[in-house]
């Protein structure tokens, strides 16, 4: 714990967890050569509220690696139905997320889970209604063409609270 503060011990309540205030530690490194670290507020009409986006690896790059972006969805935030022309890979890193392919079942994503969205397949993803969610989005082939559609029905979305 920082000087002058006592470390918290024991389990925290659900209410305490829901009201945690996160503070980003100052960065010692700076982005260089197309690599970035910190996620910044990102507002888009394709998300129902603000998300946080970090361009971790941009493409094209010297290594020939695909583009990697870190996206953090606060509790209850999700995106519109959309389709990636080149496909997309999602790697869950934080919290609990939801992912659904058109005409498919909703899949729960927890840290370490991976979802593959084939080229041309419509899907949506985001935080569960009762949890925040973070993922790394990988855009194969160094391209990233996206077609956006409508939002999933909010009443349907809210039915998907997930046990933590």
Where are the language model's segments positioned?
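A short, N-terminal "cap"/entry segment at the start of jelly-roll beta-barrel domains
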Residues: 1-65, 146-164
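Conserved short histidine dyad/triad with adjacent acidic residue
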Residues: 52-55, 67-84, 119
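Short, conserved beta-strand element in jelly-roll/cupin
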Residues: 70-74, 83-99, 138-141
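Short beta-strand His + acidic residue motifs that chelate non-heme Fe in jelly-roll/DSBH
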Residues: 79-81, 99-100, 122-128
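Short acidic-glycine-tyrosine-enriched beta hairpin
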Residues: 103-120
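A short hydrophobic beta-strand segment most commonly corresponding to one strand
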Residues: 130-150
